[in-house]
Amino acid sequence: YIRTISDGQVQVNCYYPQEDENGLVTTIVLPGKSIDYQNSATGDAEFMGKVLEALTKQEQDGILANLTAGQLDVWNGADGCIDNLTILVEGENAGAFTSHKSNYGGTETICYGLRVSAYNLISTGSLNLSDYSVVCHEFLHTLGAPDLYRNGKNGTPVGVWDQMAQVPPTPQYPLVQTRSDLGWLTMPEASVSGDYTLAPATATSGNRAYVLKTQLAEDEYFVVEYRQKKNMGEYDNYVPESGLIVYRVNKAVPDHTNRDGNNYIY
């Protein structure tokens, strides 16, 4: 999915240290119940510290001995940091275990002395609702994409048109503005009268969007893009119809997010 929406510019390499040489998975299960790892007032740092402490103890006790040297070599000699660690928590998508992305600044290390940078906590409850799409959403946070939904469900300024606003079972393309913010696409400005041709957002070449600027606001502009409703199982299957969409972008909004009630994209 990431390779597709980035026009092949981002290739995500996923490593599964719990997978043996025959391709079978022996799940790494941490001791205790999920509530034992629940955040308190100190927040996510406490949760991640407990997870890494439990992993380290399992490693010391030989519980992780099923991991072969060849499997761990995918981490050996890296830059000293695991870019993104995904943790599955069995249970409802609620409270401290609502699926989310966070950064960890602790000094604990695992597997060849590697520190953890970003991590994605994924509840099995959210997987039941949104399938692998929720994994895409949280990993896009790791890559730098902001939330485009409203916290508290107060309005839907973007809706199903961007993966960072709604998470259907099959992921949709992010808006071209989001892909541009991540450095994957450029959006030319339509500054003179004339005929302009848009390639659909799902295309791999051509202009996927045009910017329309106004003299009324320096930090605000409109974006025009063309979306095509796809077949079941394909990205963009959940958009309601094919057609032209126009949205406003306000670069003055802090953190370029809709989450806190302001409209970065509307």
Model-found features: residue ranges?
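Extracellular hydrolytic enzyme modules, especially secreted metalloproteases
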Residues: 83-239, 250-252
